[in-house]
Amino acid sequence: MIQSTQPLATTRAQLLERLAQTETFDLAIVGGGATGLGVAVDAAARGFKVVLLESLDFAKGTSSRATKLVHGGVRYLAQGNISLVREALHERTTLLHNAPHLAQPLAFVMPSYKLLDTPFYGIGLKMYDALAGKAGLGATEFLSSAKTVKYLPTVQQKGLKGGVKYWDGQFDDARLALALARTAAAKGALLINYCPAEKLIYENHQIAGLICRDAESGRNFTVRAKCVVNATGPWVDLFRQQDAEAQGKPVKPMVAPSQGVHVVVDREFLPTDHALLIPKTADGRVLFAVPWLGKVILGTTDTPRHDLAREPLPFPEELDFILGEAGKYLSRQPTLADVRSMWVGLRPLVKPQDDDGENTKKISREHTVMSSKTGLVTVTGGKWTTYRAMSEDVLAECFRIGRLPSRPAGVTVNLPLVGAPADGAVTHRMNQSQGLHSYGTDAAAVAALPGAQNWLVDGLCEAMVRFAARFEYARTVEDMLARRSRLLFLDARKAAEIAPRVAAILTEELGQDVHLNDFLALTRQYLPAQG
């Protein structure tokens, strides 16, 4: 049963006034992605006075561009990283439990074209089950070729010997980020997007806060805080460099960025509730075909990238690789003309000492938390699945260096996120189109707003736009169509078509420029060049 709740307003003028009026925060977090938002939830839940500042929109960077999987990491098991797999499996269970409206179990099928592939991969996945223990989502199955085709109707049948089925999870990354932001706010944290942290403040050679700027008005704010956390993902080295300059010494970069390209095609390419896993591509990596929100995601790549663009573009060879590899395992070869949207995420992989950063498959997927002599706490690496454990490690470091008084961990293990049904019931599947069901317990509040019956496109009504403006921090058309609705990531052409109508509603709600033309230009980057 879904109960009605009263959402917390996110009126920007009130948020900024609160920022101006607060004398000192316990914790100032820079970065509104999965990691920063997770720290905000944990710290606020422990009773600390928290502010989080994001230069653009929450989850604008890496955290909205994942492969949408909540997973223990099958490939990490193959690398022998048992501790990472065990932690991730535990966190997978916690996430699925705390946000069942946004994260759910998903069955994967791995087709086998060699006789020994089924037992080889199956035994490894049985180990995966064993590591999961009671946290397992379902037992690994060895499949006949007929059963494999039943689960994957469009799989390439020529030479098919059988398959293996196992369980992991999937989620809506951007909406989970919003749920974290709203959960932190409900616990008393102050979160502001479009408010970049510009400069660190020092007293007696120790960090005492920062200066931030409201990107909409240009107004500067001095934010004093007992502890400052740098959770800016692939961009953490920019703040570390500023901190190092204050100390008068150079800093060695700790991030080796890698980009992952994802391509979205129509459901007809994989008309099933099961995901397809390609265990070994031409370059030895894993490739997924994942049903998600009425479409299918194909991905991903793992390409070193030395620039840090906010909107990175795929290399042509990456698109060729994904479509080509998918075509080897699907009965119909997807082409560029079939691409409905595409996106690139930058992974903040932790760079080992003396590594040139070129082999991103072997660079650490684990997270790193460190602090400087001035007291700047930096966290990077990791993945969405383990965001909660990362948050606990960040606060442990804040305690260790004496910036905050220690308080017991574990407060977020059984903390339902905003929108989660009290009984933990799953009311819809993640592979169906978006709709009011995506809001969980907020569905009634959305339906009560004007325009609940005015559908702009399948899965998006006028009331959802109003709800985003009033209760979900949305400031622009992009915020709405990329991260409150996921339409830009599902069908960039449709997103462009309805953008003017969305802009009109947002303008009515916010009374300001909502950057329609910027969004229309952006939609073109989410489609491959034709010809």
Segments predicted by a language model, with ranges:
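A conserved short coil-to-beta-strand element within the FAD-binding core of flavoproteins
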Residues: 193-208
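Glycine-rich active-site loop/strand segments that organize a redox cofactor
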Residues: 59-86, 90
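Short hydrophobic core segments
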Residues: 29-30, 223-233
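C-terminal accessory subdomains/tails of enzymes that are appended
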Residues: 15-18, 24, 28, 56, ...
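Glycine-rich Rossmann-fold phosphate-binding loop(s) that bind the pyrophosphate
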Residues: 32-33, 55
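Extreme N-terminal leader/targeting segments of oxidoreductases
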Residues: 1-27, 42-46
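Glycine-rich FAD pyrophosphate-binding loop
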Residues: 44-65
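Core beta-strand elements of the Rossmann-like FAD/NAD(P) dinucleotide-binding domain
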Residues: 23-25, 217-227
